[in-house]
Amino acid sequence: MKTVIYPGSFDPPTNGHLDIIQRAARVFDKVIVAVLNNPEKNPMFTVAERRKMLEMITKEYANVEIDDFNGLLVDYVREKQVSIVIKGLRAISDFENEMQMALTNRKLAPDIETIFMMTNHKCSFLSSSVVKEVVAFDGCIEGLVPEQIQDYIIEKRNSQRK
């Protein structure tokens, strides 16, 4: 059984993230979507909230599991006894950053492979940062994030303004 880990901040999950999850779920037997708890970032959503949103948008996929981790990705991947990490790429600028991280991971753990998957061209401009900026200015996030979590994101924004 081939299992892959798809790590990320997912703050919040976007249609680009969902595109990678859906396609990975077709290619691999099991996809573990791993939410990074990065204490150096100031996320809009807690790890629990990000997990909840990911569970909401992937509930129809029996082979997708949502998890979270702290620390080095390679340590988490080994803990899960997985040898493949999948990363989504939107543009050449993503490749440069992801390639550097993949090579670092290879140096730390030569037994772990990184596979790059191109995001659907319709999502090539999309990032969690773009979504957060649009929602901060009361813009419409329809088409940027999965429909199931649009209200959740707007409610979070509204609660932060109180």
From Swiss-Prot:
Enzyme kind, highest EC tier: transferase
Catalyses which reaction(s): (R)-4'-phosphopantetheine + ATP + H(+) = 3'-dephospho-CoA + diphosphate
Family statement drawn from the similarity comment of this UniProt entry: Belongs to the bacterial CoaD family.
Marked site positions, Transition state stabilizer: 17
Functional description taken from the UniProt entry: Reversibly transfers an adenylyl group from ATP to 4'-phosphopantetheine, yielding dephospho-CoA (dPCoA) and pyrophosphate.
EC number(s) given by UniProt: 2.7.7.3
Gene Ontology CC: one annotated term: cytoplasm
Highest taxon listed in the record's lineage: Bacteria
Any one GO BP annotation for this protein: coenzyme A biosynthetic process
Cofactor(s) annotated in UniProt: Mg(2+)
Residues noted as binding ATP in the record, renumbered to the chain: 9-10, 17, 88-90, 98, 123-129
Binding, substrate: 9, 41, 73, 87
Involved pathway(s): Cofactor biosynthesis; coenzyme A biosynthesis; CoA from (R)-pantothenate: step 4/5
Keywords: ATP-binding, Coenzyme A biosynthesis, Cytoplasm, Magnesium, Nucleotide-binding, Nucleotidyltransferase, Transferase
Localization annotation: Cytoplasm
Subunit organization: Homohexamer.
GO molecular function terms noted in the UniProt entry: ATP binding; pantetheine-phosphate adenylyltransferase activity
Protein name: Phosphopantetheine adenylyltransferase
Database matches in Pfam families: CTP_transf_like
